[in-house]
Each structure stands twice: as C-alpha cells, then as structure tokens.
C-alpha cells in the first residue's frame, strides 16, 4: 500500500519533462522579498526561482508589491510573478515614500545642475530648506514604520500576509501547485506558505536560510520566534538552511523528529560567455568590500588596519555606512572610498576589479555570509575576517583555498595586509589559490537550484506533515 501511495504521488507531480529528463513540478514560492528588492534574501530567492524555471519547472512567485525607492525591473524570464499590496497603513506608507522619493530626486537634480556624482564617491550636495523638510517627513515615516513594527510579529512586513493569502488561495484553486516553498527572511513568506499548506494539504518546503530565532531577534519576540521555528521544523515536508552549523542548531533545538534537513548555501550567478580579464593597477593593494554592515559585523578593525598600511586602499559599496565608518571615509577620502549603493551587476564589476575582496564574519552566529560565497565567482582572492573561534565560515577559506584568513583585530589584519602587499609586488598574490567560476561550480545558482528541485520532489512524494 505504501509503495502504491508513493507511485500515486510521483504520478501527480506532472508529466511534463524537465531539461534533465525528470518530471516537471508546479512550484509556488511565497517570498516577501523578491527582485527588485535589494535584500540578500531577495537575491537568493530570485536566483533559485530562476534556476528552477530554467530546469523546466512551472514556477509561480507570490511576493510583495514593489516598495518605494525600488528600481523597476523586468521579471526574470520563465517565472509567473504575482505581486500583492500589504494594504492599510503599509500601503499608505508606500505611496507617501514614493512621493517623497520623487521630490528628493528632483531636489538632487536641481542641486547638481544635471550632473551625476562619480560612482566611487558619495554625493555631498548641501541640504536646503526644502530637503530639510523632506528629511523631517522621511523621519516621520521611519518613526511610523518603527511604531507599527513593534505591534506585529515579528515586524510590519507581516501585514502583507492577509492580501497575499487571499491571492494564494485563488491561485491554488486555479493552478494546483504540487509543492509550496516558504522563504525566510522575513518571516512573512514562511507564515504565508505554512498557512496555505495547512489549508490546502499541499506539502511545503521551509526555505529557512537562517534560523527564525537569532541573536538579533528583539526580546519581545524571542519566545514567539522559537515557537514558530519549532512548528515549522515539524510541519514542513523539508527544511533548507544555508550551513551545516545551522542544520545542527535546528536539530539541537527541536529534536530528531523534525523534517529532513538539506544544506543549500548561498552562491553566485553563472556568467556566459566568460567575462574579459581585468587590467589592475600595478601599484598598491586595492581592497573592495561590497554589502551591508550589521551590528554583528564590525568594520572598524579593518579600517584602522588599512589606514595604518601605506599602499592599501579600501573601496566600500553598499546602502549605507555606520557613523564611525562614514566619519573615517570623510576624513580619509584617498584611502577609504565609498561607492554608495550599486546594483548587482555593478557590484560584480567592482569585485572583479579588486586585488582582494574583504568579507567580515557574523559574530556569535551559525550563518555564513552570503557575500563570501558570491565572491567565489569573481575570480579574486578573499580576505576573510573571523570574528570568533566558533565562526563556521572560516573553514571555507582553508577548505576551498580561496583566500586569506585573519582574526578581526587590527594587529592581525595589519600583519596580513603587509604580507599581501609584498605578494602583489612580487607577482605572487594569487599563488596557490583556487580562483574563478570553474573552480567553484558547485556554488553556482543553477547547480544549487538542481539541489532545491530534488528537495521539492522528495517533499511532493512525502506529502504534508502534521506539526
């Protein structure tokens, strides 16, 4: 009887064949963050969804309507993307933010008289009475969003779930997906997928990425986060995390009865045809850091080490800087260069121009920075700054021979920078390292999507679990 049920489930997965000769699946992905949202999770979901579609699967994405300030982009080919508004106050905030953003752009155009700032420096246009008024309104919106976040678990993004749930029910009745993927972070995608799965009986895959309960979870939501994490781990047909350390943490927290765990790390996009070689400066050591800064990633030991190392420069690209780092960039513009926020293709181009790419580990956490694995596709060595002995990402540097490792301390970084300067002067900077996309093909998003497809197929056969 069990064998007959398994055959029935496999038969229900569909008769269309994928590019690899397997039966195609109908997959619904629930993700609050999706292209053009610039968040790291948006990049992950967009790449994995595109990879599933490229394999021949029928993939629909249920996501939030584009927020204010997001650059309009075409949806990735092969995907059906359904965007729903959060409604209510969140929708009003979106509209107000768009209006303020448009007014800011007009002010900037007037201030710079039609010129554009260099992509390597931050714009320093002086504020006017008009921009001050816009800043006050922007702060008021930020305060309102913070106020609303404090009253919804775990933040205001969960207000998107209501409208998305109604659209998801309609989509399921018309299209009948065989598996649902819930994306985290934020929690909204996970909550939506879980609700749709319970209502429909369709199994869901918890694409956790990182734990729901983390070191930065607000105290008021810690108990609720742990309970949601527990329920999802027992209710989902499969769980996906980004590191072995996170998988071990889930088993330790929630016991051996949880759903099957798979580790699918972050990755990088395949580039075809291969990009041309970059001609780099013969003098000095050019360091590049792309990405965000968080309270658990301290950039100041790196900054102090660079300032103490003649011949080194550091270019930073990201959505913003911590105050102390912003001050240092303003005081040392020839050494510390802030490129501002770049789109993904611009960030990749900047990475390829570097002598060495810098990544800072997450202190006290099991997560591996996604940027570290993205760097593997750039063809450049990585300087990884290890925050503590338990950091799981540090092992990647030694195992993959992709760069250099130092404690996130000024003395250790300074000593390594001195060594790297010498290696470059001697023409040995890349010596002994594995570099380039071909060396790390297992981290390409298209390969990772194949692994996610296998997880989805197993989940569809296993069926829905009960929490």
Language model region names:
Residues 279-297, 303-306, 452:
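Conserved donor-binding/catalytic core segment of Leloir-type glycosyltransferases
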């Amino acid at each position: 009887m069990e064998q007959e049920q398994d055959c029935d489930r496999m038969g229900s997965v569909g008769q269309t064949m994928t590019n690899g000769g397997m039966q195609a699946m109908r997959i619904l992905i629930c993700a609050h963050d999706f292209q053009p949202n610039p968040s790291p999770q948006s990049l992950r979901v967009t790449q994995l969804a595109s990879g599933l579609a490229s394999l021949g699967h029928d993939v629909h994405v249920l996501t939030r309507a584009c927020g204010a300030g997001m650059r309009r982009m075409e949806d990735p080919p092969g995907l059906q993307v359904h965007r729903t508004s959060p409604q209510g106050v969140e929708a009003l905030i979106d509209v107000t933010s768009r209006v303020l953003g448009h007014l800011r752009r007009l002010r900037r155009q007037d201030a710079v008289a039609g010129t554009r700032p260099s992509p390597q420096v931050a714009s320093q246009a002086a504020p006017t009475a008009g921009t001050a008024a816009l800043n006050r309104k922007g702060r008021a919106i930020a305060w309102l969003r913070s106020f609303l976040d404090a009253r919804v678990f775990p933040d205001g993004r969960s207000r998107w779930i209501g409208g998305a749930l109604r659209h998801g029910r309609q989509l399921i009745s018309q299209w009948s997906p065989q598996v649902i993927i819930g994306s985290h972070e934020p929690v909204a995608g996970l909550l939506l997928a879980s609700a749709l799965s319970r209502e429909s009986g369709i199994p869901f895959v918890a694409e956790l990425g990182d734990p729901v309960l983390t070191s930065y979870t607000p105290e008021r939501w810690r108990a609720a986060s742990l309970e949601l994490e527990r329920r999802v781990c027992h209710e989902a047909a499969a769980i996906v995390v980004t590191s072995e350390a996170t998988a071990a943490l889930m088993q330790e927290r929630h016991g051996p009865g949880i759903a099957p765990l798979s580790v699918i790390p972050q990755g990088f996009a395949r580039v075809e045809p291969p990009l041309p070689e970059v001609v780099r400066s013969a003098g000095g050591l050019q360091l590049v850091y792309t990405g965000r800064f968080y309270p658990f990633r301290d950039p100041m030991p790196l900054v102090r080490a660079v300032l103490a190392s003649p011949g080194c420069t550091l270019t930073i690209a990201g959505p913003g800087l911590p105050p102390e780092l912003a001050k240092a960039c303003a005081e040392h513009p020839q050494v510390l260069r802030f490129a501002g926020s770049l789109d993904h293709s611009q960030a990749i181009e900047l990475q390829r121009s570097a002598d060495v790419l810098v990544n800072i580990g997450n202190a006290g956490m099991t997560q591996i920075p996604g940027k570290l694995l993205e760097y593997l596709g750039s063809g450049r060595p990585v300087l990884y700054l290890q925050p503590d002995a338990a950091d799981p990402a540090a092992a990647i540097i030694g195992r993959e021979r992709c760069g250099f490792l130092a404690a996130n301390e000024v003395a250790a970084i300074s000593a390594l920078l001195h060594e790297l300067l010498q290696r470059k002067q001697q023409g040995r900077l890349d010596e002994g390292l594995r570099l380039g996309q071909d060396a790390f093909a297992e981290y390409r998003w298209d390969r990772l999507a194949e692994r996610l497809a296998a997880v989805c197929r197993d989940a569809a056969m296993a069926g829905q679990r009960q929490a």
